[in-house]
């Protein structure tokens, strides 16, 4: 570890001197000797060169001291063989894999920041060219070319097949090929030109070099330039390609007829052109020529009288129709499966019915004693909630919130939702002490201020009135908890009434005895 303000190169020189001689360098301070000894354990000498091996002694990094060697290492690690320049992270990784000095991280950053080539490349923005999709608006304006094979060598030495598909009408032309050289493919394309004319563009999914060779051959044979373009250039939508049904059927047909498959390619292409295709429901033949061909479907011209010797075209046509039906059924079945899966998924969803909000579940009213809920209270490392109180409902706002007063009579600042309140139920000891305390206070007050009213009778009247009020309130309240509270209160009031009647008798007896004493003294 290099102390703050110390030169890193000097630190490495002191370590090298200590490893080589076993003594401290003259520039080493006494306070630095222990650090030099600890750091020297991470270095070794090999072939008179100092290497950093680390604490695990698995590294082997050459120690660089001079500035010239540092610049040479940075130049080699920053530039690769192809002339490209690495960034800070890659350059630092290459330097630290083989070399060591104390300020390697800062030196790499400064080197990359000062590199003129990197600054120019950083400020250069390469804008990708916009892809212009070719619009297919007319028949035989944009066609695709696909090469299939190799198949079994036919009797006429054909091994491959070329498929040309019009993207507007889906018209298909299939021709056999002996090989897939640029000259052979170009000759087949020229033969199709002589039948339908050249299109505006031909799209092929081949290498650029092969496409360039075909363009050269087409220019030599037909005098047209750059008509073939690459499929990877993004000039056509991915949906507008050769139907996969054609390729699948052609592969099967060539495998079933290995010797004369090339004789049936015209029949296969014509059969595809007269069958219905989605989504237009019109045949490619009708799209191409705006009419349907004469097809003797009702007559037996395609079949012999015996029914066994069916013509080849009829077999091909029936097979293609069967393949189309299979594809439609697969598409329909897949759609039904997806719909069924969606239905099952929707059925499997658990519908959680939210409970309606209870604005006043306990039917609380003004004057009731309640507890309020205190939420988001941080305790023991988590948020908690508790019930605090008791409080008395002062009044209820129009929005259904309650304004409370605490036990000292002070009104709380903020209204509380009724759903955050619950009734405060006193314990039995609290209620008994409350009533006894109230009785003693009332008795003293009545004895001093109202001597004409019997004390026990007045207190009994108060308790009876409270009992009747509780009965009236019981008719108004509908909550089960309120009813239990009132029943409990009534059970506590009845013995208190009896006790106060006894107290009344004792009080009158004391008054009588005191009157007798006064008469005797007078």
From Swiss-Prot:
InterPro entries in alphabetical order: Integrase_cat-core, Integrase_H2C2, Retrovirus_Pol_polyprotein, RNaseH-like_sf, RNaseH_sf
Highest taxon of source: Eukaryota
Molecular function via GO: nucleic acid binding
Record-linked Gene3D superfamilies: 1.10.340.70, Ribonuclease H-like superfamily/Ribonuclease H
GO biological process, one term: DNA integration
A Pfam family it matches: Integrase_H2C2
Domain Integrase catalytic: 135-292
Record protein name field: Gypsy retrotransposon integrase-like protein 1
Organism: Macaca fascicularis
Gene: GIN1
